[in-house]
Swiss-Prot record:
Function: Guanine nucleotide-binding proteins (G proteins) are involved as modulators or transducers in various transmembrane signaling systems.
G5 motif, as annotated region: 325-330
Subunit structure: G proteins are composed of 3 units; alpha, beta and gamma. The alpha chain contains the guanine nucleotide binding site.
Stored InterPro entries: Gprotein_alpha_I, Gprotein_alpha_su, GproteinA_insert, P-loop_NTPase
Domain G-alpha per the UniProt entry, residue ranges: 33-355
Name by which UniProt lists this protein: Guanine nucleotide-binding protein G(i) subunit alpha
Single GO MF descriptor: metal ion binding
PANTHER family: G PROTEIN ALPHA I SUBUNIT, GTP-BINDING PROTEIN ALPHA SUBUNIT
Length: 355
């Protein structure tokens, strides 16, 4: 009898042990399929645009209702951009070539101040169109490196006819280009190639960086985003600091941080489209006085790539995976993210001893 009870207890213990092993195996498989990505970079590098692309590429994109919710943001971004240009005309002592536009400018500020936030009335839109087409305004816009202006200014102001129409609903591209400062941490979840991604977008302005630290533990990879086009610009929060130099300092502190010895670093050199337009007019020596190459896209972009990759102090142990990106180009981001995922899968297999 005692023997039978002992056998039953042993059998029960064995079943329990088997279940625990199975649960542990399943938990391990789930953990292996979970990928935590930390999206880092200085302010206005394009991180939030990449998050929006993940929604478009790996989820269902933005519904009609969601796009409608972005209409006030589009209007606000457009109005604020034109305000920034006209204010800069005063600072840079640029006159309106057509003197009647000075009255339009005063009227524009009055109407914009009185309008509800995110509203664009027909009267306001017509004044904005006249101002935007004025040659003094265009001259000031071409000198935008001398003041703070959103990258999307020309995109929206060139589209005034379309966005001012009654019943306007922002397109996916309009939504991608909206600019709202990220504060705190935004988490996005999606699945791709049998992996479950958690993407953390962290505020890039200096005042936000202290909030990053508790995201660090257990991160699979860091995607560090740099605005290539920032090489001739200064920070919004510190007009003595060049944006590219600030990005390099931040990258150095992340890449060589003791917490990230085992963490894959993926470098997105972003806004390559704006950089390509800018580099022929604004030399790279503004940021890197020692640069002796030509001011063409390929040479200049590769020089910046080398400057960042050379900051890696553990080249023998750690590889930087660099990609040139345009965050507003869905096809480009889809292609690059596919390559990034393959690197993550390969590194996961290496960690498991299967590669």
């Amino acid at each position: 009898m005692g023997c039978a009870m002992s056998n039953a207890a042993d059998k029960e213990a064995a079943e329990r042990s088997k279940k625990i092993d199975k649960d542990l195996r399943l938990a391990g498989e789930r953990a292996a399929r979970e990928v935590k990505l930390l999206l880092l970079g200085a302010g206005e590098s394009g991180k939030s645009t990449i998050v929006k692309q993940m929604k478009i590429i790996h989820e269902t994109g933005y519904s009609r209702e969601e796009c409608e919710q972005y209409r006030p943001v589009v209007y606000s971004n457009t109005i604020q951009s034109l305000m920034a240009i006209i204010r800069a005309m005063g600072q840079l002592k640029i006159d309106f070539r057509d003197s009647s536009r000075a009255d339009d400018a005063r009227h524009f500020f009055t109407l914009a101040s009185a309008a509800d936030e995110g509203e664009l009335t027909p009267e306001l839109a017509n004044i904005m169109k006249r101002l935007w087409n004025e040659s003094g305004v265009q001259h000031c816009r071409n000198r935008s490196r001398e003041y703070q202006l959103n990258d999307t200014a020309a995109y929206y102001l060139n589209a005034l006819d379309r966005i001012a129409r009654p019943g306007y609903i922002p397109t996916q591209q309009d939504v991608l280009r909206t600019r709202v400062k990220t504060t705190g941490i935004v988490e996005t979840n999606f699945s791709f190639k049998n992996l479950n991604f958690k993407l953390f977008d962290v505020g890039g302005q200096r005042s936000e960086r202290k909030k990053w630290i508790h995201c660090f533990e257990g991160v699979t990879a860091i995607i560090f985003v740099v605005a290539l086009s920032g090489y001739d610009l200064v920070l919004a929060e510190d007009e003595e600091m060049n944006r590219m130099i600030e990005s390099m300092k931040l990258f150095d502190s992340i890449c060589n941080n003791k917490w990230f010895v085992e963490t894959s670093i993926i470098l997105f050199l972003n806004k390559k489209d704006l950089f390509e337009q800018k580099i022929t007019k604004s030399p790279l020596t503004i940021c890197f006085p020692e640069y002796q190459g030509s001011n063409v896209y390929e040479d200049s972009a590769n020089y910046i790539r080398m400057k960042f990759e050379n900051l890696n102090k553990r080249k023998d142990q750690k590889e930087i995976y660099t990609h040139f990106t345009c965050a507003t180009d869905t096809n480009n981001i889809q292609f690059v993210f596919d390559a990034v995922t393959d690197v993550i899968i390969k590194n996961n297999l290496k960690d498991c001893g299967l590669f």
